[in-house]
Amino acid sequence: MDLTEAEDMKKRWQEYTEGLYEKGLNDPDNHDGAIIHLEPDILECKLKWALGSMTMNKASEGDGIPAELFQILKDDAVKVLHSICQQIWKTHQWPQDWKRSVFIPIPKKGNAKGSSNYCTIVLISHTSKVTLKILQARLRQYMNRELPDVQAGFRKSRGTRDQIANIRWIIEKAREFQKNIYFCFIDYAKAFDCMGHNKLWKILQEVRIPDHLTCLLRNLQTGQEATVRTGHGTTDWFQIGKGVRQGCILSPCLFNLYAEYIMRNAGLDEAQAGIKIARRNIHNLRYSDDTILMEESEEEQKSLLMKVKEESEKGALKLSIQNTKIMASGSITSWQIDGKQ
């Protein structure tokens, strides 16, 4: 491969990834910057806990510091990191190296010539993960307060097996009582990459996340930079204008809150929706962005799906119509959404 072709490949990857994360024109910045209540300082014992939970033998990026170094330095590492974390906590400003990510594209099955047919793994600074772990622990208490039982994504003692078991049980009971049931398996197109930042800050405010934590999250997302590492070298650095950070442990928490806001606005918290089980109406099961809608009639299922679609688009999330599927125990007609069947 000649130099010109290699440079063209890098340029194409940069254009594709930069376009994917380009800030939307309908996502204006409306933050007033006021912080009234400060969260308690970070304790050294919490820092030791965060260091102890880190996974070893992982590739390092950004500052180039491997996780194993913290094990070697022990208390010396705790003192230095505690000073850095405290400074971030009080000033709400993150080191720029901690806001940089390296994308490595991995081809999926099928045609490997199209950039959209790749998934990416992302390398971020190991040092930043210590502060992120502490911030995640602070966020989790608020997340557990806001999220319903039907959301099992990235939550302690819950998982996909629980949701699969729930679906099997619902189907068995529907057969036992000879009731029709309609499932809609929703698939979003690049859900984590499309979230509007300022929409996210508004949602965090509405669910009463402390301003201090929201400011830390906002400043982490603002000014993000990324590069794509290809087989022909790395691209220039470019700005990330939307979506949550890939490879960041905070991203699933933030997406769950974002998705919960959408589902509430779609009316999924209404008592009359869904199917009735043990005096309770169940209308959806979720694992992060993977959502199943449930109804006892086809018309109600269509209506619920259109509400979710409409509210999702208000939040810059688009349904992948091609990958959204319907499963029914009774008769069903052909559905068309946006001209697609």
Model-identified regions with their sequence ranges:
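Conserved catalytic palm subdomain of right-hand nucleotidyl-transferase polymerases, strongest
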Residues: 57-65, 103, 113-123, 161-202, ...
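Inter-domain linker/hinge segments that demarcate the starts of reverse transcriptase
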Residues: 44-53, 80-88, 134-138, 163-175, ...
